[in-house]
Structure formats: structure tokens, C-alpha cells
């Protein structure tokens, strides 16, 4: 079964919208390595339409320009790219296709194919649905030390909590935290009566 990972730039107050407006001051070699590791380990990239349009509007030109980011751009171009959208799309970036049918059903089929990892970058609406369906194996959050204070947040209002477990954590020189979470079983019921035993006792 294929592993599905999602990587997101996120502010301290949970904003994931328009990261290009606030995250570049924190981008360094550590973050570059983290992003490359997530996308580079996948042979398939799953996008929402807006994120795909952003990538397709930049990375083919960067590959053609032959600059220092050209190898990464080529790897993205060579990967299979699947775009989730309710609209009929004209996809011009090579190796791109539109996801057909229900997102959760289609991704379930993809997950069971005998290929490499599937990665998402951004694509918040897709990430939300895959988290809720428990199809996401790893959620990579690059938490920036800034409160953006406006914009869409990763988790929307819903009735059902999504329990997660921390797989790994590291801090970058810029103050960014690289947190990797995976799905967890539902937390047990507990109250303050259960918690108070763990409070530090004052010195007598």
C-alpha cells in the first residue's frame, strides 16, 4: 500500500492561506531539504486546482531556465500529477491528469496501487478531506514563528475531532518547527479528576 504524505507551510495561529506572502523570510537550507525530501520521495503528486495552477504557472518555466532549481523543477515535471477539481480542466504541464469521480474513492484506489509514495503540497481542501477519511499517512507541518492573524486555517469547523500522533519534530535555525504527524486512535475519555494526579506537587 502506498504512503500518502502532505506538506504545508503554516503560521503559529494555524493560517495556511497565501504562504508566499509571509513564509519566504524563513526559507533556508533546512526547509529546502525538508520540502525536497517530502516531494522527492513520491512518484505521484496530488493537487487541488488552485495549488496546481500555482505550480504549473511557475515550475515549467524554472525547469526551462536551467537555474539552480531546475533539477527540482524537472523532478516535479517528471512526476505523475493528479488534479482534484469539480471543473473540467485543460492541463498543459506534462504528466498531468484530472482525478475522476469522488475524491476519497479515487484516492483509495490510488493508495492501493503498486507504486511509490503519493505527496501533496498545499491543497488544503484535499488535505482536509483525506485527513477526515483517514487516508493520510503523514502530515508534515512547517510551523512558522509568525501569527498571520487572517486567512484560511488548516482545520475548519466540524463535529468530529481528528486525533493525531507526533512522529517526529525538529527545529530550524529560523525558529520554524518541522512537525510530522500521523493518524492516531481516538483519545480515551478523561476529566480533570484524571489529570490532576499529574500536576507537580509544591515543595513542603
Say what each PLM segment does.
Residues 138:
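A contiguous pocket-lining binding segment that forms or flanks enzyme active sites
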Residues 1-135, 145-204:
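Portal/gating segments that form or line small-molecule/metal binding sites
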